[in-house]
Amino acid sequence: TAMSVPVSEVGKHFSNEKRTVATGIVTAAASVGYFLAPLFTQYTLGTVGWEHTLKYFMYFILFGLITSLFILPKKQVSVLKTEKSQNFTDAMKEAFSHKGYVLLVAGFFVCGFQITLVGTHVPGYMQDRGLGGWTATIILSLIGLFNIIGTLGIGYLGTKYSKKVLLSILYFLRAIIIAIFIFSPPSIYMSIFFGITFGLLWLSTVPPTNGIVAQIFGTKYLSTLFGIVFFSHQIGAFAGSFLGGYFYDLYGSYDYAWYIAIALSIFATLVHLPIDEKPIARVVRQA
């Protein structure tokens, strides 16, 4: 949830040509933590217990809180300056009257659904398929490790190609990878394949999504507008976590949750294509 704040804060300080690279670096830094957290948690739970594990994570949170105090507002780049007369209400009306923004909000729901379904239910899913707990740890750690590469790569590609097309490709690839994962015989090799390939796509949706919002509306209300998009992501995260457990309790299997994840990927692939990425007239006049 907190990641939307530094991503938007960094995004305010870069032009459209460089923004996805900058936000890709921020997202990659988050992935370093995601790579280390499963390994660290698995180790500390086995050596010092859950009480000390929670205490260690409290220290990490305090570290993040302290460092956040040093994030000071700086002057935004002039080419991204929006009309000073625009207030919050006008910005919200403008955004929700833009079809592309509504589609972006809908599409990011899918990202939240998928990554939380994987992050929450892969451990149980792997045990159901006869593989040990360390297999899930390996998958989640590989996801974090390779997402560093994925977010940096998509950040660079976002400076060269259409961001909406990149998002459609990312979601389409997710559908293929999930299908291969659930329909293939369970093995450590397939688990490694899934961790690597899904990791490349894990948070790679963040830089182009943030970039589209800033590109269309400017950066004055970027944190708020991207925060709303991210709120949709978190609703999807709730749905992915809840439905995974619900279907398992109902049918004794995660299969239906995976089927929904694949269907949502196809939906997201299509829903991003009609987005008009061009800056609105107000932003063009101010550039």
Predicted segments — roles?
Residues 19-38, 227-240:
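Glycine-rich segments within core transmembrane alpha-helices of 12-TM secondary carriers
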Residues 25-76:
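Helix-loop-helix hairpin linking two adjacent transmembrane segments in secondary transporters
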Residues 98-154:
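Extracytoplasmic gate region of multi-pass secondary transporters
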Residues 151-162, 249:
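Helix-to-loop junctions at the C-terminal end of transmembrane segments
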Residues 143, 160-212:
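C-terminal transmembrane helical hairpin of 12-TM major facilitator-type secondary transporters
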Residues 1-28:
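Cytoplasmic helix-loop-helix junction between adjacent transmembrane helices
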Residues 73-90, 281-287:
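Flexible cytoplasmic inter-helical loops of multi-pass small-molecule transporters
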Residues 10-20, 213-222, 252:
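Paired intracellular helix-loop junctions of major facilitator superfamily
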